[in-house]
Each structure stands twice: as C-alpha cells, then as structure tokens.
From Swiss-Prot:
Gene name of the encoded protein: tmk
One GO biological process term: dTTP biosynthetic process
Superkingdom in the source lineage: Bacteria
Function: Phosphorylation of dTMP to form dTDP in both de novo and salvage pathways of dTTP synthesis.
Descriptive protein name: Thymidylate kinase
Keyword Flavoprotein: no
Keyword Kinase in record: yes
Chain residues that bind ATP: 10-17
Assigned keywords, A-Z: ATP-binding, Kinase, Nucleotide biosynthesis, Nucleotide-binding, Transferase
PROSITE patterns: THYMIDYLATE_KINASE
Pfam families attached to this UniProt entry: Thymidylate_kin
Annotated TM spans: none
Length: 209
C-alpha cells in the first residue's frame, strides 16, 4: 500500500491533538506504520522558528510577510528532512497542520495575498498536497475558550476574534474547493468526532472494520 500524507487542520482549540490520537489508534490497529509531527515545527530548526513566531521575545514587530516566510522556512525544513523522506520509505505521515494553516492564518487572518502562499508551496515544496485533510471546524469563540484552558495564549492566539473569523472562512473555502478534504463539526462530542474520523479513514484506506 502506498504511503499516505494525512493532515489535521483547524483553529486553535478545535481538538487537533485529540483527533491525531484517534488517527494513531486507527493506524496502529491496522498495522500501518506512521510518524506523527506538527507545524510550525517538526524538526529542530523548524521548532526554533516556531518558538520565534509564537513567542517573540524581542522588542521588534514581526510583519505579516516575515511571519509567513519564517513559517515557510520551517516548513521547507520539515518537508524535505522529515515528510518527504518518510513517504519515500513507505511510511505514512500524520501532521498537525500543513500549508492550509498558512493559507488560513497568514492569508485570511493577516491578509497576505493567497497567491504569494501558493507560490511558496509550488516553488519550495514541489506543490506537495496531502492525500487527506481532515478539517475540524469550530466557532472561534468556543475554540479560544478551549485553548485558554490549556495554557497562556501565544502570539497568534492573541490576534483577536475578527482575525479568527477571517481564518475560519479561508479554511471552510478550502474544504469546498478541494476533493481531498473533509470537514468535521468539532463542537460535537469526542465520541462522535472519533466515530467520524474512523469512518473517513475506513473510506480513505478502503478498509471495512
């Protein structure tokens, strides 16, 4: 079976980590080897860039274009040093976020032109597209409430409600436009979300469990 690149997307507080635990459980049950990773981050250099973007300790503004380029510098490291080699070896890759998050957060939220983001993807990631994107949709107010229970808000989580409304809109537009994406209502119970994820994976891997 050809290796798969699966991405979990959604606003902060949507439950991506929980969803990934369900994907892990499913793949392990079906004896499918996989690595689990995240963005921003995924490699040592990418994690350093993540820390700079989310927890800027310097008395200097990070401009929207700079934020995008730092995230993409980390993404190139992540893709070339971890994602692509694993897929070439026949190992499935499951990632908490990928380039959709840049389209939504930097494009929708910050207002960076989406064409710039697509160009970065085409030029530096060979136009890489996940085999499957599971988008967890949640109202930004509920998502931020959930995120605040986990810990102190990071730099992006402090961006405000309108920022997240714009971000959500781009996520939902992407789901409508792409055949490899499925939306789940993340406000539903954990049990219902788990059930839906298993059904999606059954169909994707052509399994009948």
């Amino acid at each position: 079976m050809q290796s798969k690149f699966i991405v979990i997307e959604g606003l902060d507080g949507a439950g991506k980590s929980t969803a990934i635990s369900f994907v892990r459980k499913y793949l392990e049950k079906n004896n499918l080897a996989a690595i689990y990773t995240r963005e921003p981050g995924g490699t040592k250099i990418a994690e350093e860039l993540r820390n700079l973007v989310l927890h800027n300790k310097y008395d200097e503004e990070i401009h929207s274009d700079s934020e995008l380029l730092m995230i993409y510098a980390g993404r190139v490291q992540h893709y070339r040093n971890l994602i692509a080699p694993a897929l070439e070896k026949g190992i499935n890759v499951v990632s908490d976020r990928f380039y959709w998050s840049s389209m939504a957060y930097q494009g929708g939220g910050r207002g960076v032109e989406l064409s710039k983001i697509r160009a970065l993807n085409d030029n530096f990631l060979n136009g890489c597209e996940p085999d499957l994107v599971i988008y967890l949709d949640i109202d930004p107010i509920l998502g931020l409430q959930r995120a605040q229970k986990v810990g102190s808000p990071d730099r992006i989580e402090k961006a405000g409600l309108e920022f997240f409304n714009r971000t959500r809109k781009v996520f939902k537009d992407l789901v409508k436009d792409l055949d490899n994406a499925i939306e789940i209502d993340a406000a539903k119970s954990i049990q219902e979300v788990e059930k839906q994820i298993y059904l999606i994976l059954d169909k994707h891997f052509n399994f009948q469990n």
